[in-house]
């Protein structure tokens, strides 16, 4: 099963969803940045701690070209908006929830799950393949756009 969880180097599967201000945000528009694609539920008990870790990474690397594209699977859109209003990165909400085709496309078995996408919009690694997220982000920030 570990083999199927690995990411083959693939182009990003497009996602365009409304953000917490109602604007459509496209994942593929972030080409040129190193992106953490994060599938998240703000109503989960580990959410607050996870957000603190992400904020530290974002603050440390955003100026170098790191972005977070966080997809919420909370069932209540208002709750999602209140939970994300102070977050500096891109937070989008999938109104299809657990029935979303995006979850199928990215083979999401559980949430939270994240991926690292390089500056060329190529999926590079899935969370289970990453031991040191900080070092992983540094590595991909050091790679150029082709």
Locate the predicted segments by residue.
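N-proximal helix/coil linker or "cap" segments that precede and/or mark the start of modular domains
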Residues: 1-18, 28-31, 59, 78, ...
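Generic structural signal for well-ordered beta-strand positions
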Residues: 25-26, 124
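Conserved redox-active cysteine motifs that mediate thiol-disulfide chemistry
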Residues: 31, 38-56
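Alpha/beta-hydrolase fold active-site loops
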Residues: 33-35, 112
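Hydrophobic beta-strand anchors of alpha/beta hydrolase catalytic cores
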Residues: 36-37, 68
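Structural microenvironment flanking redox-active thiols in thiol-disulfide oxidoreductases
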Residues: 48-85, 98-102
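Thiol/disulfide oxidoreductase modules built on the thioredoxin-like
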Residues: 97-142
């Amino acid at each position: 099963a570990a083999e199927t969880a690995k990411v083959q180097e693939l182009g990003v599967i497009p996602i365009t969803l409304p953000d917490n201000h109602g604007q459509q945000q496209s994942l593929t528009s972030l080409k040129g940045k190193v992106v953490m694609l994060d599938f998240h539920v703000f109503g989960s008990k580990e959410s607050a701690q996870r957000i603190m870790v992400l904020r530290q990474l974002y603050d440390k690397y955003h100026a170098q070209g790191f972005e977070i594209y966080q997809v919420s699977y909370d069932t209540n859109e208002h709750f999602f908006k209140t939970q994300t209003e102070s977050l500096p990165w891109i937070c989008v909400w999938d109104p299809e929830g657990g029935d979303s085709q995006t979850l199928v496309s990215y083979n999401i078995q559980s949430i939270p799950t994240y991926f690292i996408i390089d500056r060329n919009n190529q999926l590079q690694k899935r969370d289970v393949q990453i031991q040191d997220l900080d070092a992983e982000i540094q590595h991909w920030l050091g790679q150029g756009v082709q």
